[in-house]
C-alpha cells in the first residue's frame, strides 16, 4: 500500500499532474480517532511537544453516518521513504494505543505549503 502510494505520486509528478515531489520534503498529515474529545486534545498536545503541528479536530456533522467519532489531525513537514513512513506508521499505532485512543487512522501527504 505505501509502496503504491509513492509509485502513484511519482507517476503524477512525471505526468505533470502535481508540482511537488513525494521524495522531497512534504506536509504529512496524520489522523487519530476517538469518541473522547479531551483524550484527542491531550494526544495532540503530546504530539505537538514532539514536533508535530496540531491542526485540529473534526467533529461529526449532520451528514456523517457516525455521530460519535472525532478525528484529530496533526501535520509534520518532513521527508520520507517507503521504509521510514512504514516505521512512522508503526510508531503512531503504538502511540494511539498508549494514549488509549480508538485508533491511528492513517496519513495523507501534500506539498509543504498545503493547508
Predicted segments, located by residue:
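Long, contiguous binding/interaction regions
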Residues: 1-115
Amino acid at each position: 500500500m505505501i509502496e503504491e502510494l509513492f509509485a502513484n505520486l511519482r507517476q503524477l509528478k512525471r505526468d505533470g499532474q502535481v508540482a511537488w515531489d513525494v521524495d522531497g520534503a512534504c506536509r504529512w498529515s496524520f489522523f487519530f480517532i476517538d469518541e473522547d474529545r479531551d483524550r484527542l486534545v491531550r494526544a495532540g498536545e503530546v504530539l505537538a511537544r514532539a514536533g508535530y503541528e496540531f491542526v485540529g479536530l473534526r467533529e461529526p456533522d449532520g451528514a456523517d453516518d457516525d455521530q460519535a467519532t472525532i478525528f484529530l489531525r496533526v501535520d509534520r513537514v518532513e521527508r520520507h521513504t517507503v521504509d521510514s513512513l512504514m516505521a512512522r506508521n508503526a510508531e503512531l499505532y503504538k502511540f494511539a494505543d498508549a494514549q488509549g485512543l480508538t485508533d491511528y487512522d492513517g496519513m495523507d501527504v501534500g506539498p509543504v505549503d498545503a493547508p
